Amino acid sequence: MLDEIVLKEIPGHQKIYHRIGQDILIDQKINDWIKQLREKGRAGVRAPHEIEDISYIADEMRLIKSDFEIDMMRRSAKIASLAHNRAMKFVKPHMYEYELEAEIMHEFMSQGIRSPAYQSIIAAGGNACTLHYINNNSEIKDGDLILIDAGCELEGYASDITRTFPANGKYTKIQTDFYQMVLDAQSAALKMISTKHHWNEPHEAALSVLIDGFRDFGLCQGSREEIYETGAYKEFYMHRTGHWLGLDVHDAGEYKNVSKEWKQLKPGMTLTVEPGCYIRPSSKVPKEFWNIGIRIEDDVLVTQDGHEVLTKESPKTIESIEALMAK
């Protein structure tokens, strides 16, 4: 049936628009249709002679959110924020990570959300140093930091939040120092989110703060420029500072334009800002730093006047987190 319809409709058209590479069977089907039409060329049937990948066109449209989409993303971000707050208030040493995951899901479902936007990460202690840890089955020990990366999906629109907080409600001195470094890196990145800046500037701003911090802690040696050029910082910070957000958690859209320059930020774009620090056990690292894993992630909307943090209802300063956990 489909073959009959397509073979009737596409003759005489110059171009077929198609998302190339997403489904190899559909790719082959289109090639077969064109081949069949070309075989009828002597009968005056004109086959399309171009196939254009529609991905770039559709992805560019998805970069700028409509008012409806922004409203959905605000609501999704609020629900995810409430879920993170619930986990902070619920946690106790000697619980298991999956118990916090259950609290996250409880909040999602009580707000009408049937599923998370992605597999939630509930990582206590050294588990937080594994970027995509999803086992969520370890016991939470007194003194652990807990990294939760969790978001929900509302009407197809994703939220994506990470918070890192102490299992016992109080950051230690070392945890405080590293946490503040990551928070300062995020603050520096947020200052670069406006229509005056391009995509990579928030990452560059966050990375500068982190590199300086790694030097101060003795984790990296040399000048900021040397550490950047050699990539020595990647032992402790190995990912980018953000990604597009929307219908997918890592949403569609290029990060550079056709001239290979970073895209300028525009009103309606939505992205994450998520610097981190991950210190695995190593003979090169002071033992008191081992197993510290911290990430702070917010969802951000670019506006005419700057930006709006959509996930602002979940606390992230040391004082505000400790105050919430003490309630």
Language-model-detected regions and their locations in the chain:
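Active-site neighborhoods and metal-handling regions in enzymes and metal-associated proteins
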Residues: 1-327
